[in-house]
Curated annotation (Swiss-Prot):
InterPro entries: Dihydropteroate_synth-like_sf, IspG_bac, IspG_bac-typ, NO2/SO3_Rdtase_4Fe4S_sf. Pathway: Isoprenoid biosynthesis; isopentenyl diphosphate biosynthesis via DXP pathway; isopentenyl diphosphate from 1-deoxy-D-xylulose 5-phosphate: step 5/6. Binds 1 [4Fe-4S] cluster. This is 4-hydroxy-3-methylbut-2-en-1-yl diphosphate synthase (flavodoxin). One of its GO terms (molecular function) is 4-hydroxy-3-methylbut-2-en-1-yl diphosphate synthase activity (ferredoxin). It comes from Vesicomyosocius okutanii subsp. Calyptogena okutanii (strain HA). Converts 2C-methyl-D-erythritol 2,4-cyclodiphosphate (ME-2,4cPP) into 1-hydroxy-2-methyl-2-(E)-butenyl 4-diphosphate. GO terms for biological process: isopentenyl diphosphate biosynthetic process, methylerythritol 4-phosphate pathway; terpenoid biosynthetic process. The keyword 4Fe-4S applies.
Length: 358
């Protein structure tokens, strides 16, 4: 399906997290974060594998203690997907995981401490040729900013980011990306808009603490969608109180909806009504489950009646229109009649067969 609008992305420098390019002309990457105890190596490895299988490009791992840092070393030795070490409060943990092969160090300006601590982290990042993410969060701004602004604001977040960018500039370090996250959509959007016009470093997008799978998906889609539609953003993480695999799927659905990155089946389906000639909701649910393993982009339509079915089918690889009889379309042309009992199996078979020709 040919998009009617192309988003022109903001020009930015390019950095690498492991073998994944961030910024420049690289595709917008997707990441998630483990929620296991990092010291539980087996559980963390299992979750990293699940996140990777869902299609994530990067995985972030929380390193709250030196014990977790030592566990990270064991974990890093057993995975190939780039790992980002999430560091708060203790800069020495960042120094440790850099030695253990972290592909990126995430530090929080609000709690990492003094400039000399940051200087040591930067020196370590230089030694190991790894980038840093300056991760500004509205909920953990520096105390002087809390006093100055009295409450979190986009301006406070941008000031925090610019202060730390200045520190890195003075240390001759430009291998970094920035994030400005809040749980409130417009605070996040305004902060990114303000900062993006002042710097050309890659931007990591996210609505932090977005909430449950249902509500958090809506908040993240609106917030990230507003920014991405304006060309802002080089890597994204959807933060949900849910399985990290859900974060990956939602992130790709956001990118897919904006035609920024295609992955897997783009399933176009009607909401159904009394005109439907088969159970649209049941068929779509079953197909979504069966299509989870598909990575190659392909457009598929499932429409319950002839009002919009034929029209939608003309612009997809595989289309189904409800009727008497139901009609299956391939590449916009009528292919065959299909009875309700065979809908899911036949449609899946045709999709997988069409993938061979893409």
């Amino acid at each position: 399906m040919k998009p009617i609008h192309t988003i022109h992305r903001r020009e930015s420098k390019q950095i690498f997290v492991g073998n994944v390019a961030i910024g420049g002309d690289a595709p917008i990457s997707v990441q998630s974060m483990t929620n296991t105890k990092t010291t539980d190596v087996k559980a963390t490895l299992k979750q990293i594998s699940e996140i990777e299988e869902a299609g994530a490009d990067l995985v972030r791992v929380s390193i709250p203690t030196m014990e977790a840092a030592r566990a990270f070393k064991v974990i890093k030795e057993q995975v190939t997907i780039p790992l980002i070490a999430d560091i708060h409060f203790d800069y020495k943990i960042a120094l440790e995981v850099a030695k253990y092969g972290a592909d990126c160090l995430r530090i929080n300006p609000g709690n990492i401490g003094r400039v000399d601590y940051i200087s040591e982290v930067v020196a370590s990042a230089k030694d190991h040729d790894i980038p840093i993410r300056i991760g500004v969060n509205a909920g953990s701004l520096e105390k002087y900013l809390q006093k100055k602004y009295t409450r979190p604001t986009p301006e406070a977040m941008v000031e925090s980011a610019l202060r730390h960018i200045d520190i890195l500039d003075k240390l001759n370090f430009d291998n970094f990306k920035i994030s400005l996250k809040a749980s409130e959509i417009f605070m996040t959007v305004f902060a990114y808009q303000q900062l993006s016009s002042q710097i050309d470093n890659p931007l990591h997008l996210g609505i932090t603490e977005a909430g449950s799978l249902s509500f958090g998906t809506v908040k993240s889609s609106i917030g990230l969608g507003l920014l991405l539609s304006k060309g802002i953003g080089d890597t994204i993480r959807v933060s949900l109180a849910s399985d990290p695999v859900d974060e990956v799927r939602v992130a790709f659905n956001i990118l897919k909806s904006l035609n920024l990155r295609q992955k897997g089946v783009n399933l176009i389906a009607c909401p159904s009504c009394s005109r439907q000639k088969f159970d649209v909701i049941k068929v779509v649910s079953e197909l979504e489950s069966r299509f989870k393993d598909i990575i190659t982009p392909i457009d598929v339509s499932v429409i319950g009646c002839v009002v919009n079915g034929p029209g939608e089918a003309k612009s997809v690889s595989v289309g189904l229109t409800g009727g008497d009889p139901n009609l299956l379309y391939l590449d916009g042309k009528t292919h065959s009649k299909i009875i309700n009992e065979n809908l899911v199996n036949e449609l899946e078979a045709q999709v997988r067969n069409s993938l061979k020709n893409l």
